[in-house]
UniProtKB/Swiss-Prot annotation:
Region (Transactivation): 287-346
Purpose: Transcriptional activator that binds to E2F sites, these sites are present in the promoter of many genes whose products are involved in cell proliferation. May mediate growth factor-initiated signal transduction. It is likely involved in the early responses of resting cells to growth factor stimulation. Specifically required for multiciliate cell differentiation: together with MCIDAS and E2F5, binds and activate genes required for centriole biogenesis.
Protein name: Transcription factor E2F5
Annotated region described as RBL2 association, given as residue ranges: 323-340
Compositionally biased tracts (Low complexity): 1-16
Top-level taxonomy: Eukaryota, Metazoa, Chordata, Craniata, Vertebrata
Composition-biased stretches (Pro residues): 22-40
DNA-binding region: 47-118
Molecular-function GO term, any one: protein dimerization activity
Example GO biological process: cell projection organization
Region (Leucine-zipper): 76-98
GO cellular component: chromatin; cytoplasm; fibrillar center; intracellular membrane-bounded organelle; nucleolus; nucleoplasm; RNA polymerase II transcription regulator complex
Length: 346
């Protein structure tokens, strides 16, 4: 028999073996299991993860797009394409919530605008303006605290002065002090009980071009004392006489009035600078009925000037002791309504 030829396998027999022998068979090798392929993120060929599909993350990305948009205006179709959102209702859910909390507003059906940024608005300028306003508020609060502290100190100082028995006799204001505070003005010093109502109507223009002034005072608890204080120059002494003036001043006399002294001298109460204002006013009322020459209250120049005017500016409204009041005043009426008094022209 002829020997069989070895099959041509491309493998050469190892050295030392005959050509007619085959190599021993190899046992099959076990293959390791392959891990599953990782999921693809956001790709068209693979599904998205649960985290990528969450509404919170989608809202964060949407707000970022909205803040980066020009003038804060964002097109919803472009946003859906950028965020790769297949269901546009998720975008509408986000816009409905943001619109509900007043962060955005709809410009059109598919366009919204962020309210934090307007057309032509510079965010940096707004921030700088906000910082400036906050600094200004802090400065005003500091000044307010300083004023409150000064107010407390003044109130405590006044309390200390009023409570001190030694300082009580110095709690008065002289006529010179008042005139120095209101230099060049005619002053009316009013002593009235608590609750007195004071009303100054709007002045009317008179025929001679001057304004007509009125002052209405009403008290339900006691009398009202008014003093007229006048001072022509800084060197002269104040002239004080009661309002209304004494009876002898309101009645013109044929005899000429002669000045008592070359300079206008004050009343007798001016010699008591340490008395209270109320004490001086009571003394003025007690001495108002005395003679002009004995009181020395008003100089002849002032009397001549007052008497030469068309309407005597100081009128006695109090009735005589024999007469009595037979009239009433309504709540909207003043003192002038009780008497037939012409509006004074000063």
């Amino acid at each position: 028999m002829a020997a069989a030829e070895p099959a041509s396998s491309g493998q050469q027999a190892p050295a030392g073996q005959g050509q007619g022998q085959r190599p021993p068979p190899q046992p099959p090798q076990a293959q390791a299991p392959q891990p599953p392929p990782p999921p693809q993120l956001g790709g068209a060929g693979g599904g998205s993860s649960r985290h990528e599909k969450s509404l919170g993350l989608l809202t964060t990305k949407f707000v970022s797009l909205l803040q980066e948009a020009k003038d804060g205006v964002l097109d919803l179709k472009a946003a859906a394409d950028t965020l790769a959102v297949r269901q546009k209702r998720r975008i509408y859910d986000i816009t409905n919530v943001l619109e509900g909390i007043d962060l955005i507003e709809k410009k059109s059906k598919n366009s919204i605008q962020w309210k934090g940024v307007g057309a032509g608005c510079n965010t940096k300028e707004v921030i700088d303006r906000l910082r400036y306003l906050k600094a200004e508020i802090e400065d005003l609060e500091l000044k307010e605290r300083e004023l409150d502290q000064q107010k407390l100190w003044l109130q405590q100082s006044i309390k200390n002065v009023m409570d001190d028995s030694i300082n009580n006799r110095f709690s008065y204001v002289t006529h010179e002090d008042i005139c120095n505070c209101f230099n060049g003005d005619t002053l009316l010093a009013i002593q009235a009980p608590s609750g007195t109502q004071l009303e100054v109507p709007i002045p009317e223009m008179g025929q001679n071009g001057q304004k007509k002034y009125q002052i209405n005072l009403k008290s339900h608890s006691g009398p009202i004392h008014v003093l007229l204080i006048n001072k022509e120059s800084s060197s002269s002494k104040p002239v004080v006489f009661p309002v209304p003036p004494p009876d002898d001043l309101t009645q013109p006399s044929s005899q000429s009035l002669t000045p008592v002294t070359p300079q206008k001298s004050s009343m007798a109460t001016q010699n008591l600078p340490e008395q209270h204002v109320s004490e001086r006013s009571q003394a003025l009322q007690q001495t108002s009925a005395t003679d002009i020459s004995s009181a020395g209250s008003i100089s002849g120049d002032i009397i001549d000037e007052l008497m030469s005017s068309d309407v005597f500016p100081l009128l006695r409204l109090s009735p005589t002791p024999a007469d009595d009041y037979n009239f009433n005043l309504d709540d909207n009426e003043g003192v002038c309504d009780l008497f037939d008094v012409q509006i004074l022209n000063y």
